[in-house]
């Protein structure tokens, strides 16, 4: 790890966090339900893009760009974009407001759909 790697991860993380914030606000303006749709869609779309790009970066792009794309995009941007901690907070809020079964369902659905999205993205990249 070099100083330039730290810079790329930090820059990418800032971009990803801003994207997450903006998309979350945009979804919140349209969707008024109790389900944490913004966090769910952000995490699922991020899982899809990570699955897709991880295949491209490992197969085609590493020779051209080295580890820059992996560092800046996968770890930085998509690491800042997706949000495990917000998913956990949303589940905790659901558990106190509506019951543990709904919170558990949200977590299970998030993980299963996220895995499917990442696998689908990887499959498309092949």
Curated annotation (Swiss-Prot):
Subcellular location: Cell inner membrane
Transmembrane segment boundaries: 7-27, 37-57, 68-87, 101-121
Record-level GO cellular component terms: plasma membrane
Gene this protein is translated from: fluC3
Biological process annotations from GO: cellular detoxification of fluoride; fluoride transmembrane transport
Domain of life: Bacteria
InterPro entries, A to Z: FluC
UniProtKB keywords: Cell inner membrane, Cell membrane, Ion channel, Ion transport, Membrane, Metal-binding, Sodium, Transmembrane, Transmembrane helix, Transport
Coarse class of the protein's main subcellular location: membrane
Secretion signal span: none
Species this protein is from: Yersinia pestis
Function, in words: Fluoride-specific ion channel. Important for reducing fluoride concentration in the cell, thus reducing its toxicity.
Alphabetized Pfam families for the sequence: CRCB
GO terms of molecular function: fluoride channel activity; fluoride transmembrane transporter activity; metal ion binding
Bilayer topology: Multi-pass membrane protein
Regulation: Na(+) is not transported, but it plays an essential structural role and its presence is essential for fluoride channel function.
S-S bridge residues: none
Sites where the protein binds Na(+): 79, 82
Name of the protein in its database record: Fluoride-specific ion channel FluC 3
Coiled-coil residue windows: none
Family recorded in the similarity comment: Belongs to the fluoride channel Fluc/FEX (TC 1.A.43) family.
Reactions mediated catalytically: fluoride(in) = fluoride(out)
């Amino acid at each position: 790890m070099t100083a330039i790697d730290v810079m790329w991860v930090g820059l990418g993380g800032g971009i990803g966090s801003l994207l997450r914030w903006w998309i979350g606000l945009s979804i919140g303006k349209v969707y008024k339900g109790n389900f944490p749709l913004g966090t769910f869609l952000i995490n699922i779309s991020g899982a899809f893009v990570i699955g897709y790009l991880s295949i491209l970066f490992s197969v085609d792009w590493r020779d051209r760009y080295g580890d820059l794309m992996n560092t800046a995009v996968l770890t930085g941007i998509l690491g800042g974009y997706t949000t495990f901690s917000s998913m956990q907070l949303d589940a905790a809020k659901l558990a106190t407001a509506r019951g543990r079964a709904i919170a558990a369902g949200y977590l299970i659905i998030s993980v299963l759909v996220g895995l499917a999205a990442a696998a689908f993205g990887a499959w498309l990249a092949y």
